[in-house]
């Protein structure tokens, strides 16, 4: 299952992770985000070597701005922070 990440735990969950981390920036009102969600959840279940996280941009607009998210869904792969 994908981990919901907040600003206060982003460093621990993503930046300091020991392996690759896939982050899905999404919003509940976004139709394409809702279509992508089952794929992200399936990926999280099947790929144990990649940590999968989700960031709700309505709840965490600072994270979206920090990483230059201009549209959603946006998926970013972090490696070594």
Outline where the language-model segments fall.
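Proteins that catalyze or organize thiol-disulfide redox chemistry
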Residues: 1-51, 58-80
């Amino acid at each position: 299952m994908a981990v919901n990440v907040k600003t206060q735990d982003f460093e621990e969950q993503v930046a300091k992770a020991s392996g690759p981390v896939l982050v899905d920036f999404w919003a509940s009102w976004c139709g394409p985000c809702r279509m992508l969600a089952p794929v992200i959840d399936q990926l999280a279940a099947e790929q144990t070597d990649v940590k999968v996280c989700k960031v709700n941009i309505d709840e965490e607009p600072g994270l979206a701005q920090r990483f230059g998210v201009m549209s959603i869904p946006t998926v970013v792969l972090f490696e070594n922070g």
